[in-house]
Amino acid sequence: MGKNVVVLGTQWGDEGKGKIVDLLTDQAAAVVRYQGGHNAGHTLVIDGEKTVLHLIPSGILRDNVECLIGNGVVVAPDALLREIAKLEEKGVPVRERLRISPSCTLILPYHVALDQAREAVRSEGKIGTTGRGIGPAYEDKVARRGLRIGDLFNPERFAKKLHELLEYHNFVLQNFYKVEPVDFQKTLDEALGYAESLKPMIADVAARLHELRKQGARIMFEGAQGSLLDIDHGTYPYVTSSSTTAGGTATGSGFGPLYLDYILGITKAYTTRVGSGPFPTELFDDIGAHLASKGHEFGSTTGRARRCGWFDAVILRRAIEINSISGLCLTKLDVLDGLKTVKLCVAYRNAEGVVIEAPTDADSYVGLEPVYEEMPGWSESTVGIKSLAELPANALAYIKRIEALVGAPIDIISTGPDRNETIVLRHPFA
């Protein structure tokens, strides 16, 4: 029987999941997105050519790999079709290999308007949303009033539901946020205009996954964002609106947890975060600026600069627990090349003493200071190294210390952005 693997982020997103999914799909029959929307930004570098994907699974650049968008994803049809067009310009036959669940909730213009209006009026406590309508679309889904992709193929029903929704949302936009309403007819015409382009790609994704399972095919599930942004387990309220942990795989695809064989957690060799929210190891000095510059820490979706800090074993231990991580992939090790010393956060400290467990909400991080272990750095370059034996001794010691601190094996080490710049110690599909 085939093996089924989940790849997800263990920090606050931007860990390098796209590259690893692309690398591992040489042995997969299908890749599935199961949560999030086009707020994700997965960067792939293949033979020096960079591709950024937002909605389409990262397996799309591998010939003959099926790419599936599960019911847990919220879809902006205009953004999806633009992404398809860009890939087709590069000669990628997207429409032949992409299948989308009709149960995906749609992101429509009023979701974007609400998202941006809310963030604009927050005087403090800004969430740091991408402003792309993700949160409001999930709100409609949970409130059981969301429009789904399948609704596009029944124009009369779609128009009726849209009219009711716009009455509600426009009232909020005009009376609470004091902004212009969203036009019904324009929204209706645009949405129904997408139906013809999307229809050939619509399929029962859950049924297809179980077909593949029965055939013994290998399936990969590609997470977006990171575990500490999970709506339930993240640094609430500075989180995304979907289930970014391994549990979201089942609910967002219709593929039960019993069939998942290996969960790969992606973690940077340091820590980053975009937008607001707690970040105990954040650096405001030259080292932080160095990590941001050398690591090219700018969001692939928003272009926003990422906050940078030392590696945090406390949050990684929590991510390992809530995801049942089988093994880790350590990315961007090369960014630490040249530093005289490197630090790892092993615990936090507050007025009451030492804290070894990650808090369960943002407010509980207030007053926490990191407790660091310091290790010697390495002057040698790790860029492009493909075997453990070639690593500098101090870099290897750093890796081994992370394994000891978090209690999980590091099975893959990324030493550069290209898919070939990788050390694979244990293949998830093996």
From Swiss-Prot:
Residues at which GTP binds: 13-19, 41-43, 306, 332-334, 414-416
GO cellular component: cytoplasm
Reaction catalysed by this enzyme: IMP + L-aspartate + GTP = N(6)-(1,2-dicarboxyethyl)-AMP + GDP + phosphate + 2 H(+)
InterPro entries, sorted: Adenylosuccin_syn_GTP-bd (IPR018220), Adenylosuccin_syn_Lys_AS (IPR033128), Adenylosuccinate_synth_dom1 (IPR042109), Adenylosuccinate_synth_dom2 (IPR042110), Adenylosuccinate_synth_dom3 (IPR042111), Adenylosuccinate_synthetase (IPR001114), P-loop_NTPase (IPR027417)
Gene3D superfamilies: Adenylosuccinate Synthetase, subunit A, domain 1, Adenylosuccinate Synthetase, subunit A, domain 2, Adenylosuccinate Synthetase, subunit A, domain 3
UniProt-annotated catalytic positions: D14 (proton acceptor), H42 (proton donor)
Biological process (GO), any one: 'de novo' AMP biosynthetic process
Keywords noted in UniProt: Cytoplasm, GTP-binding, Ligase, Magnesium, Metal-binding, Nucleotide-binding, Purine biosynthesis
EC top class named in words: ligase
CDD domains: AdSS
Locations listed in the record: Cytoplasm
Cofactor comment: Binds 1 Mg(2+) ion per subunit.
Domain of life: Bacteria
Pathway assigned to this chain's UniProt record: Purine metabolism; AMP biosynthesis via de novo pathway; AMP from IMP: step 1/2
Role noted for this protein: Plays an important role in the de novo pathway of purine nucleotide biosynthesis. Catalyzes the first committed step in the biosynthesis of AMP from IMP.
Homology family: Belongs to the adenylosuccinate synthetase family.
Identification of the protein by name: Adenylosuccinate synthetase
UniProt source species: Azotobacter vinelandii (strain DJ / ATCC BAA-1303)
Species lineage: Bacteria, Pseudomonadati, Pseudomonadota, Gammaproteobacteria, Pseudomonadales
